[in-house]
A protein has these predicted regions:
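Outer-membrane beta-barrel "beta-signal"
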Residues: 158, 180-191
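Outer-membrane beta-barrel biogenesis signature
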Residues: 1-14, 21, 123, 129-131, ...
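A short, acidic, flexible beta-alpha connecting loop/helix-capping segment that sits on the rim
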Residues: 170-176
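C-terminal transmembrane helix-loop-helix hairpin of multi-pass membrane proteins
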Residues: 153, 164-167
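Surface-exposed coil loops of outer-membrane beta-barrel proteins
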Residues: 1-58
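Conserved structured catalytic cores and adjacent interaction surfaces
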Residues: 140, 175, 183
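Detector for outer-membrane/organellar transmembrane beta-barrel domains
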Residues: 32, 49-151
Length: 191
């Protein structure tokens, strides 16, 4: 439901682009390896002195029961203040569906100070007609001297028919120095 949980805690390194001009290229090898790269800018131009360009690369390997991806992104910023990100995502799905699949992500950020964030999630793929997912992670990347806040999420997703899935869920976001934010929602997806 929430963006940070949806991108496995590595949205700055893996989820780059889409806000303005973006160009990407990728290739999936037969062996399960894939490589991708791209450039993006929230302004109307890329690779100019005025544009805040973001360059990114990703290498991934996917097998039948697991996958891992390593991503690098460099955001040169409109003022020339460069920020670099490294992200590592991994997932494992056991063959026995009684056990949950696990997904995890870890991201570092360097803009002159080091910050990091993480995510971990579990999904039981066969619970009644649907699946149950739970997850927890930081609400962003934090330096060592910042107060780290977390977000928690739980959802049940089930198909209504061949073209529609309903997903009710709940999330709790910790707020430093304030009341936590709690949300209950229902998402409908069409395919």
């Amino acid at each position: 439901f929430t963006d940070y949980m949806g991108n496995c805690g590595t949205g700055n390194s893996v989820g780059v682009g889409g806000a303005g001009v973006t160009g990407t290229i990728g290739y999936a090898f037969d062996s399960g390896f894939s490589l991708a790269g791209g450039i993006s800018s929230p302004q109307g131009a890329i690779m100019t002195e005025e544009s805040a360009d973001i360059f990114a690369l990703e290498a991934a390997y996917t097998a039948d029961t697991y996958g891992v991806a390593l991503a690098y992104a460099s955001n040169d910023g409109a003022a020339g203040d460069e920020t670099t990100y490294w992200g590592l995502n991994a997932s494992y799905t056991p063959e026995n569906t009684s056990f949950p699949s696990i997904s995890a992500g870890y991201e570092t950020q360097d803009d002159g100070t080091d910050a990091s964030g993480y995510f971990v999630g579990l999904t039981w793929s066969e619970v009644g007609p649907g699946s149950v997912s739970v997850g927890a992670g930081t609400t962003g990347n934090f330096t060592d001297d910042q107060t780290e806040t977390l977000i928690y999420e739980a959802a049940y997703s089930y198909p209504v028919n061949d073209g529609m899935t309903i997903t009710p869920g709940v999330f709790i976001t910790e707020v430093d120095g304030g009341d936590d934010l709690t949300g209950i929602l229902v998402k409908t997806s069409f395919s």
